[in-house]
Protein backbone atom coordinates (compact mmCIF):
# COMPACT_ATOMS: atom_id res chain seq x y z
CA UNK A 1 0.00 0.00 0.00
CA UNK A 2 2.01 2.95 -1.27
CA UNK A 3 1.19 6.20 0.45
CA UNK A 4 -2.25 6.29 2.01
CA UNK A 5 -3.89 4.58 -0.98
CA UNK A 6 -3.69 1.18 -2.65
CA UNK A 7 -1.13 0.18 -5.29
CA UNK A 8 0.42 3.62 -5.62
CA UNK A 9 -2.88 5.39 -6.18
CA UNK A 10 -3.77 8.03 -3.63
CA UNK A 11 -6.79 7.98 -1.40
CA UNK A 12 -8.09 11.28 -2.76
CA UNK A 13 -8.22 14.61 -1.03
CA UNK A 14 -11.71 15.83 -1.94
CA UNK A 15 -13.34 17.62 -4.82
CA UNK A 16 -11.05 20.65 -4.68
CA UNK A 17 -8.05 18.58 -5.70
CA UNK A 18 -9.70 16.41 -8.35
CA UNK A 19 -10.72 19.14 -10.78
CA UNK A 20 -14.40 18.97 -9.86
CA UNK A 21 -16.52 21.87 -8.72
CA UNK A 22 -16.05 23.46 -5.32
CA UNK A 23 -19.47 24.68 -4.12
CA UNK A 24 -19.54 27.87 -2.04
CA UNK A 25 -22.56 29.46 -0.35
CA UNK A 26 -22.47 33.13 0.66
CA UNK A 27 -24.87 35.77 1.94
CA UNK A 28 -24.39 39.47 1.23
CA UNK A 29 -24.73 42.20 3.81
CA UNK A 30 -27.04 45.15 3.26
CA UNK A 31 -25.59 47.74 0.85
CA UNK A 32 -24.19 50.85 2.53
CA UNK A 33 -22.49 52.77 -0.30
CA UNK A 34 -25.38 54.61 -1.98
CA UNK A 35 -28.73 55.55 -0.51
CA UNK A 36 -31.50 57.87 -1.68
CA UNK A 37 -34.41 58.46 0.68
CA UNK A 38 -36.84 61.31 0.19
CA UNK A 39 -40.47 62.28 -0.20
CA UNK A 40 -39.51 64.21 -3.33
CA UNK A 41 -39.50 63.15 -6.94
CA UNK A 42 -36.27 62.10 -8.64
CA UNK A 43 -35.94 62.04 -12.40
CA UNK A 44 -32.98 61.10 -14.49
CA UNK A 45 -30.23 58.60 -13.93
CA UNK A 46 -27.79 57.95 -11.13
CA UNK A 47 -24.41 56.70 -12.33
CA UNK A 48 -21.98 54.79 -10.14
CA UNK A 49 -18.64 53.49 -11.39
CA UNK A 50 -15.75 51.67 -9.79
CA UNK A 51 -15.26 48.39 -7.97
CA UNK A 52 -18.19 47.44 -5.77
CA UNK A 53 -17.98 44.58 -3.27
CA UNK A 54 -21.56 43.40 -3.87
CA UNK A 55 -23.96 43.43 -6.79
CA UNK A 56 -26.47 45.70 -5.08
CA UNK A 57 -30.20 46.00 -4.45
CA UNK A 58 -33.09 48.37 -5.11
CA UNK A 59 -35.91 48.93 -2.64
CA UNK A 60 -39.15 50.92 -2.79
CA UNK A 61 -40.98 51.62 0.44
CA UNK A 62 -44.08 53.66 1.04
CA UNK A 63 -47.11 54.37 -1.12
CA UNK A 64 -47.20 55.55 -4.68
CA UNK A 65 -49.61 58.32 -5.55
CA UNK A 66 -52.90 57.20 -7.05
CA UNK A 67 -52.34 59.39 -10.10
CA UNK A 68 -49.23 59.03 -12.21
CA UNK A 69 -46.65 56.28 -12.37
CA UNK A 70 -43.88 54.95 -10.22
CA UNK A 71 -41.06 52.70 -11.34
CA UNK A 72 -37.48 51.67 -10.78
CA UNK A 73 -35.13 50.99 -13.64
CA UNK A 74 -32.15 49.31 -12.04
CA UNK A 75 -29.16 47.88 -13.85
CA UNK A 76 -25.72 46.80 -12.80
CA UNK A 77 -23.02 46.62 -15.45
CA UNK A 78 -23.18 44.26 -18.38
CA UNK A 79 -23.86 41.12 -16.33
CA UNK A 80 -20.23 39.98 -16.34
CA UNK A 81 -19.40 39.55 -12.67
CA UNK A 82 -15.95 38.30 -11.66
CA UNK A 83 -13.12 38.58 -9.17
CA UNK A 84 -10.74 41.31 -10.26
CA UNK A 85 -8.06 40.86 -7.62
CA UNK A 86 -7.15 38.32 -4.94
CA UNK A 87 -4.74 38.74 -2.07
CA UNK A 88 -2.15 36.28 -0.86
CA UNK A 89 1.14 34.99 -2.14
CA UNK A 90 -0.05 32.87 -5.06
CA UNK A 91 2.73 30.28 -4.61
CA UNK A 92 3.06 27.61 -1.97
CA UNK A 93 5.96 25.58 -0.67
CA UNK A 94 5.62 22.05 -1.99
CA UNK A 95 9.06 20.68 -2.88
CA UNK A 96 10.33 18.41 -0.11
CA UNK A 97 13.71 17.51 -1.67
CA UNK A 98 12.86 13.80 -1.44
CA UNK A 99 12.74 13.69 2.35
CA UNK A 100 9.08 14.21 3.15
CA UNK A 101 5.87 15.25 1.50
CA UNK A 102 7.29 16.48 -1.78
CA UNK A 103 5.95 17.78 -5.07
CA UNK A 104 3.22 15.65 -6.66
CA UNK A 105 3.05 13.24 -3.73
CA UNK A 106 6.57 11.82 -4.37
CA UNK A 107 8.28 11.08 -1.08
CA UNK A 108 11.54 9.54 -2.31
CA UNK A 109 11.67 6.78 0.32
CA UNK A 110 11.39 8.86 3.48
CA UNK A 111 7.76 9.99 3.27
CA UNK A 112 4.62 8.28 4.47
CA UNK A 113 4.94 5.65 1.75
CA UNK A 114 5.83 1.98 1.58
CA UNK A 115 8.81 0.18 0.05
CA UNK A 116 10.85 3.27 -0.72
CA UNK A 117 8.00 4.98 -2.56
CA UNK A 118 4.84 6.79 -1.66
CA UNK A 119 3.96 10.20 -0.46
CA UNK A 120 0.93 11.75 1.12
CA UNK A 121 -1.52 9.77 -1.04
CA UNK A 122 -3.04 12.86 -2.67
CA UNK A 123 -1.43 12.15 -6.02
CA UNK A 124 0.28 9.23 -7.73
CA UNK A 125 2.38 7.45 -5.14
CA UNK A 126 5.40 6.45 -7.24
Swiss-Prot record:
Keywords: Repeat. Residues 87-126 are annotated as: Right arm (Gly-rich tandem repeats). It comes from the Eukaryota. Residues 18-86 are annotated as: Central domain. Residues 1-17 are annotated as: Left arm. GO terms for cellular component: egg chorion. GO terms for biological process: chorion-containing eggshell formation. GO terms for molecular function: structural constituent of egg chorion. InterPro entries: Chorion. Transmembrane segments: none annotated. This protein is one of many from the eggshell of the silk moth. Belongs to the chorion protein family. This is Chorion class B protein M1768. It comes from Bombyx mori (Silk moth). The lineage of its organism: Eukaryota, Metazoa, Ecdysozoa, Arthropoda, Hexapoda.
Amino acid sequence: YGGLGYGGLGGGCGRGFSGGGLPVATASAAPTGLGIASENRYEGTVGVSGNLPFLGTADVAGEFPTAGIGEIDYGCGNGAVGITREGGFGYGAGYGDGYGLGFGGYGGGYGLGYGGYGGCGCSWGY
